[in-house]
Amino acid sequence: MHLVSKRDDEVTQAIDQCVATGYEAVILSFGSHLNMEDTSTQNSTRWKKLADYAHQKNILLGGYSLFSSRRISDEDDVIDAATGKPGGAFFGNAPCFGSKWGLAYRDKIKQFFAATGFDIWENDGPYPGDRCASRQHPGHSNWDDSQWKQMEIQKELYRWLNERGVYINAPDWYFLDGTHKIAIGYREVNFSLSREQQMILNRQNIHDGTIEKTPSMGWGFVPLTQYQGGGPEAVLEPLREHLPAYRQLMMQYYGAGVQACYRGPRLYDADTTRQMVAAVIAWYKKYRSILNADLLQLRRADGRDWDGWMHVDPSLPWKGFIMLFNPTDTAITRTIRLPLYYTGKKTTAIIKKEQGKAMSYRLARDYTIPFTFTLPAGGYSWYTVE
């Protein structure tokens, strides 16, 4: 859960809602009242108390902090070699990690995690690769070594966090430096679209974002409340009034093995909402091993016909897990050649629709089977391969 909070009691409420639904972590999202750069004893004590409360409930607690894409000062920002002045960064203005402010930022993050016991760091705007022409910054000599030195500063920070078991979310490809999860497809304006459009877009992002990554290497986004723009048709609040859309957005991401940012003040607003969320989480946890397995893209979503994917792992009891969607306004029946090579099945396979009746299939020489499915208008379904 990505919590938008203004008060400490909202954090404890979110932790309690996670316990009630089966969620395992809360991240204080951007726009919340968490400030990791505040090194006061009062701030550390406050957040340690909340982290301790979360840990007593077996919930992980994390928080958001922005490094890049903001202006600090003429002395600490990246200096453009062409002008000798701040500016010219990838995002216009950005701090230099080798500046006094940048080195202090690194130390403040370390101090916060050491003092509070937080489990997750959402490092938005990690170092984007800006070079800096300053000759006064203590962390680098000049333009020539600025990129290398800044990357080393960030890498050392990530290594320090990893040594302490801290999980790192960041939007850039820094896996070899210590990041654990990056965006699977993220454009802020897209989350002002209608819920129906977001469903299709999310499945397109899942398709594209799992070609070079395993599902758990990417995170998606579900705006429970307004984000950037968009009207009531773009958000899920009040949650109890949009249960089918809320459920499908969860099923799509969890069915892909992708953890999304469910961003808002709460996970449920009524007992019916709580029951739905808890049921989806229980479903995900039952099939978690196969849902985190490698994913084969069957057909990319385009809103015109069926789309879907299949997880595969021959070492598991469930060798495959299929998710299929029908975005059209009419029921459809399709027959496709389902590729089962990577399930490890060689002669026959058993497929069950939502753990219902078992159907036996004989594999062709190319390890495919003719698979016929029917989906209702705007519907979806899932199947296991055994």
Show where each model-derived region lies.
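C-terminal beta-strand-rich structural cap/linker in extracellular carbohydrate-active enzymes
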Residues: 362-386
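Active-site-adjacent "subsite" loops/lids of carbohydrate-active enzymes
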Residues: 7, 45-52, 56, 60-118, ...
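Active-site-proximal substrate-binding groove within the catalytic cores of carbohydrate-active enzymes
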Residues: 153-358, 372-374
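Alpha-helix-loop-beta-strand connector modules within alpha/beta enzyme cores
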Residues: 47-59, 146-166
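Short acidic catalytic loops
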Residues: 24-33, 105, 109-140, 169
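The substrate-binding groove and active-site-proximal loops of carbohydrate-active enzymes
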Residues: 1-8, 29-44, 87-106, 138-150, ...
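Conserved structural scaffold segments of CAZyme catalytic domains across common CAZy folds
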Residues: 1-77, 260-305, 313-320, 327-334, ...
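Non-catalytic positions within long, well-ordered alpha-helices that form the structural scaffold/packing
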Residues: 19, 113-114, 254
